[in-house]
A protein has these predicted regions:
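Phosphate/pyrophosphate-binding catalytic cores of soluble transferases and nucleic-acid-acting enzymes
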Residues: 1-182
Length: 182
């Protein structure tokens, strides 16, 4: 039987040191569940494992992306589950460590089946946000999906933009893709 061991905590509390000890003890690599450590350029401020730490214990999903690369919890779920299939062929237990609860939840509980936004829709909504601000997009979201409009953090422009993107792309309310709330 395979076991996924999860170590979750905020940045800077010693997860890396503890994860190294645990990984050695259970003879496991470390699968990073940190949304910022995925990016090569975000070494400072993320408490990413050093080169020496990465040499001591194999780490996955660290320093792979450019800052301009799009990555989501849904994509993390796909990547991590595929990687776990391979790792469980070599290890009885695998340690997943990080501070991104959404990423950990995606692997452990699954994620809503929200479609990936096409680049043209993402660019159009982004351009509208830059030109006119958030208010017109909030109005659009209120019309397209009143349920999500009532729930979304209206000050978090990324969440608003994403919901509008999904509504435009699919012609359906964003909330119709959500299967659960956490």
């Amino acid at each position: 039987m395979n076991t996924l061991v999860v170590l979750l905590g905020p940045t800077g509390v010693g997860k890396t040191a503890l994860s190294l000890r645990i990984a050695r003890r259970i003879e496991s690599p470390v699968l990073s569940a940190d949304s910022r450590q995925l990016y090569k350029e975000l070494v400072i401020g993320t408490a990413a494992p050093t080169a020496d730490e990465r040499a001591a214990v194999t780490h996955y999903l660290v320093g792979l992306l450019e800052l301009t690369d799009y990555y989501s919890a849904s994509r993390f779920e796909e990547d991590a589950l595929a990687l776990l299939q391979t790792l469980f062929k070599q290890h009885r237990a695998v340690l997943m460590a990080g501070g991104s609860m959404m990423y950990i939840d995606a692997v452990c509980r699954g994620i809503d089946n929200i479609p990936t936004v096409t680049p043209d829709i993402r660019a159009a909504v982004g351009n509208e946000y830059e030109r006119h601000g958030l208010t017109p997009l909030l109005d659009e979201l209120k019309q397209a999906d009143p349920l999500h409009y009532d729930e979304v953090d209206r000050k978090n422009h990324r969440r608003v933009l994403h919901a509008v993107e999904i509504c435009r792309m699919t012609g359906k309310p964003y909330s119709s893709f959500r299967t659960k709330t956490v």
